[in-house]
Curated annotation (Swiss-Prot):
Protein name as catalogued: UTP--glucose-1-phosphate uridylyltransferase
InterPro entries in UniProt: GalU_uridylyltTrfase_bac/arc, NTP_transferase_dom, Nucleotide-diphossugar_trans
Function noted in UniProt: May play a role in stationary phase survival.
EC main group: transferase
Entry GO MF terms: UTP:glucose-1-phosphate uridylyltransferase activity
PANTHER family from the UniProt entry: UTP--GLUCOSE-1-PHOSPHATE URIDYLYLTRANSFERASE (PTHR43197:SF1)
Family label: Belongs to the UDPGP type 2 family.
Biological process according to GO: biosynthetic process; UDP-alpha-D-glucose metabolic process
Stored Pfam families: NTP_transferase
Keywords associated with the record: Nucleotidyltransferase, Transferase
NCBIfam families on file: galU
Gene3D superfamilies attached to this UniProt entry: Spore Coat Polysaccharide Biosynthesis Protein SpsA, Chain A
Entry EC number(s): 2.7.7.9
């Protein structure tokens, strides 16, 4: 199975930091955000990844490309550990492809841009703003990996969800599963997805997270999806049509998630990853503890 990662967005929520730097290249400790999402794909067994980019996102393409000059310099200076870290950015058995989204026509259109490279096959979609904490779940078995396994077993498209406080439901797409309660790692049929409902009208508190596994049927539906909210082709509209056509399931994620397209969410992720960093975590945690005493 291939994965499509739309990275063509302008990152306006993170301005001014993203004026000249793609939001996906903002660093979380010592790696850019996009690296964590690609690593998640690789851990789940995905070997072919399609990045849907924009002309302003060359830094992303360069990050996953080979840098002969850098590698030669590190080799000459016997910086073996750094050399291995640079070479591991894109594992040898993983292919990362790029396709441009010429016009900003929405998330549905961005996903559709990946069709020529994916082909008429099932595929995963990963929204790079959303980070699933690698320290809170086994990425080789849970979440995306489990969604793919569930899809392979049932043929039902999977949409990742997580519970949010009822007072926050109006900020999310919310899954209507007919009142069925889910635990982590479980799936249930979706009747509909309601975009940003009022608290009174929300069918549940299961918010869509930003991880999808779609059957190939979604491709033709995306082609037929009319212009929707914001004069854009909305992925949600295509999902609504898919739900009418075949079974689509909500998959309850395991562990923690961070919205790194939001400044507070990004800062929270930085602290959480910082205190757990293999080399820097101990010193950083000590700093945080001392800082907390002064607040």
């Amino acid at each position: 199975m291939k994965a499509v990662i739309p990275v063509a967005g302008l990152g306006t929520r993170m301005l001014p930091a993203t004026k000249a730097i793609p939001k996906e290249m903002l660093t979380l400790v010592d790696k850019p955000l996009i690296q964590y999402v690609v690593n998640e794909c690789v851990a789940a067994g995905i070997k072919e990844i399609v990045l849907v980019t924009h002309s302003s996102k060359n830094a992303i393409e360069n990050h996953f490309d080979t840098s002969f000059e850098l590698e030669t310099m590190l080799e000459k200076r016997v910086k073996r550990q750094l050399l291995e870290e640079v070479r591991s950015i894109c594992p040898k058995n993983v292919t990362i492809m790029h396709v441009r989204q010429g016009n900003a026509k929405g998330l549905g259109h961005a996903v559709l841009c990946g069709r020529p490279l994916v082909g008429n096959e099932s595929f995963a979609v990963m929204l790079p703003d959303v980070l699933l904490a690698e320290f809170s779940a086994d990425q080789k078995k849970e979440n995306l990996a489990a969604m793919i396994q569930r899809f392979n077993e049932t043929g039902a498209s999977q949409i990742m969800v997580t519970p949010v406080p009822q007072e926050n439901v109006s900020s999310y797409g919310v899954a209507d599963c007919g009142g069925i309660e889910l635990n982590g790692g479980e799936s249930a049929k979706i009747n509909s997805i309601v975009e940003k409902p009022s608290i009174e009208d929300a069918p549940s508190n299961l918010a869509v997270v930003g991880r999808y596994v779609f059957s190939a049927a979604i491709w033709d539906l995306l082609e037929k999806t009319p212009i929707g909210v914001g004069d854009e082709i909305q992925l949600t509209d295509a999902i609504d049509m898919l739900i009418e056509k075949e079974t689509v399931e909500a998959f309850h994620m395991t562990g923690e998630t961070f919205d790194c397209g939001d400044k507070i969410g990004y800062m929270e992720a930085f602290v959480e990853y910082g205190i757990r960093h293999e080399k820097l975590g101990k010193e950083f945690k000590s700093f945080i503890k001392n800082l907390a005493k002064t607040l």
